[in-house]
Every structure is written in C-alpha cells, then in structure tokens.
Amino acid sequence: MDMNSFSPMMPTSPLSMINQIKFEDEPDLKDLFITVDEPESHVTTIETFITYRIITKTSRGEFDSSEFEVRRRYQDFLWLKGKLEEAHPTLIIPPLPEKFIVKGMVERFNDDFIETRRKALHKFLNRIADHPTLTFNEDFKIFLTAQAWELSSHKKQGPGLLSRMGQTVRAVASSMRGVKNRPEEFMEMNNFIELFSQKINLIDKISQRIYKEEREYFDEMKEYGPIHILWSASEEDLVDTLKDVASCIDRCCKATEKRMSGLSEALLPVVHEYVLYSEMLMGVMKRRDQIQAELDSKVEVLTYKKADTDLLPEEIGKLEDKVECANNALKADWERWKQNMQNDIKLAFTDMAEENIHYYEQCLATWESFLTSQTNLHLEEASEDKP
C-alpha cells in the first residue's frame, strides 16, 4: 500500500464511504496551478541577475488565499531544491536547469537563454506540484506565497553552518565506508540508472548535433532564394522558372525553420531534462546508501563492542525504521518516475517523427507542384511549335 494515500480518517457512514472512493478511471482533480513568466533583469554594483514572476492559483484550504504573485531568482529555486532533498532524501526531486551554459559572459543573459531557463523553471515547479508528496511540502508552499523579505527570513531559520558541515562530514564518512549488502532490487536500480545515463547522454549529444546540422543547412538554404532571383534578371528565357525555384526554396526554408523550432522546443529540452534526471538519480542512490551505511556501521559496532553499547539497540531500531522508510519511498517514487519518463520520451519522439513526416510531405509537394507546372509549360510550348 502507498502510505502517502492512506488516511487515518475512517468514513462514518455508507454515504461518506462512497464519497471517499476514488475510481481508477476518474481523473485527478488538479488544485494547484503555477505559471512562471515575465523575467526581469536586475543590475546592482555587485551582480546582475534575473527574477521571474510566479503566479500560483489554488483551491487548497491550507493556503491563505486563492492566488499569489511573487518574484524569485535562480538562487531561490536552488534553495527550494535543497530543502526538498533535505526533507525527502530518497524521493526523486525534479532537476533544475544548469546555472548557466555559455561561451562567454556576454551571452549569459541573452533572450534565448532567459526563455529556455524560464520554461525549465516552469516545468520544475509544476513537476513538484504534480508530485503526490512534494506538493504538500511546507517549504514549497512558502516559496510560492512568501514575499521576498519573508522568504529571506525563513531561509535564516534553517540549520547553521556548523550543523550543515557536520551533516556533510557524516555523509562523506558513510560514503567512504560504502554499503556491504545493498538489496538486490537497488542493485538492479543502480544498474538501470548507469545504463540510462549513458544512453540519454548519447541521445542528447546526437540531438544537439542534428540541430546544429539543421541550423547550418537552413542558413545555407536561405541564400539560394535570393541567388535565383538575381539569376533570373540575367536569363530572359528562364525568368519565370527561376523565380518559381526561388519561391519553392523559400517555402522549404519556412518548413525547415518550423521543424527546427519543433526540435528545439519539444525534443531537445525533454532529452536534456532527463540527462539532468540521471544525475539526480545517482544522488538519490548515494543518499539511500548513506542511510544504510549508517545502519551497517552501528550493527558492526554492536557486534564487536558489546560492552560499551547500552544505547545501540535503540539507535539501531530507529535506523532500521529510517532505512525501511527510505527504501519504500524510493521504490514507490521510482515506479512513478519510470512511467513518467517513458511517457515523456515516447511523446517527444512521436511528435518529432510526425513533424518530420509533415515536413518531408510539405517539401515533396512543393517540388512536385513545381515539376508539374514545368511539364505543363513544356507541353504548351511544344503544341504551339507544331505547324
């Protein structure tokens, strides 16, 4: 049973029981809608950064209002991601886009970069909103509703530097010890993640290369239309034909541009998001292993140093519960993530295949129409030449 769906509130009457039944075919009623838009650039003497408007509309009772509007910068999104990982170490947190991918600082905040990031941040928040557990996280609610000064104040309430350093040291120590007896199902999960990471990174590189080649092809093809127009000015007998060729090239250029837009907006972001997911999954597995390694070390101490371990059995019991909760959370989220991944990848490639079919049909029809017109023209000229 999924513990997240269990409610301790028992129905008090047959009618209330019927009202609480949820049929599998019944669609989920979405009650949280988030939009990320209107990026704004801010320049100070210290730094330059972008903030994004976040509009939240909800019918949930735990929110003080039905609509909220706040502005957040990338650092705030990083904070939220960190808090979610801290609260749910073995849940699969959606990935954030990289801080920046640039060749030079001049390109850092160009329009394409800002729009690409805006879309990624929008997807990040909506994936959290759609998650059965993360959507009810208190830090997520504060992120969506608190004004800037309130969020800043809330951030300061977290663990201090020394506490965070202590957690890091313990995590490193656990990872150094490693896990001696990782359960078989998590061995299989780890193998899947490694193989998935290799394949999705390869697909990402190939997709980027295809887009680059498409861009080069498009840039070169754009030059041929004007060339044929200029050529027609010096060929009196071929004026109409050359202009028709230029028109066909122009239509094919527009079709190519549309296909490139589909590639850059539909396929590339999905593939790259799952590249980032593969990195997130490796982090989740490490955190699960750290929890188990902590339990293993306590059991080892109890086994070899029984004289000085009066409190160890109680600690071990708590750690066993912690490991069980971590494992169950990961297993449930793993199946959910795999289903979403398969649906997303399938939809992206299916849409791209349909886009390609439409593109080639459009270009083929353009040139077939041109050839038909030229054939008819030659037939007319031939009939006119007959005595």
From Swiss-Prot:
Protein name according to UniProt: Sorting nexin-7
Residues bound to a 1,2-diacyl-sn-glycero-3-phospho-(1D-myo-inositol-3-phosphate): 73, 75, 103, 117
GO biological process annotation, one example: protein transport
InterPro entries: AH/BAR_dom_sf (IPR027267), BAR_SNX7 (IPR042131), PX_dom (IPR001683), PX_dom_sf (IPR036871), PX_SNX7 (IPR042130)
GO CC annotations on file: early endosome; early endosome membrane; phagophore assembly site
Bilayer topology annotation: Peripheral membrane protein
Description of how the protein assembles with itself and partners: Heterodimer; heterodimerizes with SNX4.
Residue stretches making up the PX domain: 30-151
GO molecular function: phosphatidylinositol binding
Gene3D superfamilies given in the database record: Arfaptin homology (AH) domain/BAR domain, Phox-like domain
BAR domain sequence ranges: 178-387
Family of this protein: Belongs to the sorting nexin family.
Main function: Involved in the regulation of endocytosis and in several stages of intracellular trafficking. Together with SNX4, involved in autophagosome assembly by regulating trafficking and recycling of phospholipid scramblase ATG9A.
Subcellular location: Early endosome membrane
Alphabetical UniProt keywords: Endosome, Lipid-binding, Membrane, Protein transport, Transport
Record keyword Membrane present: yes
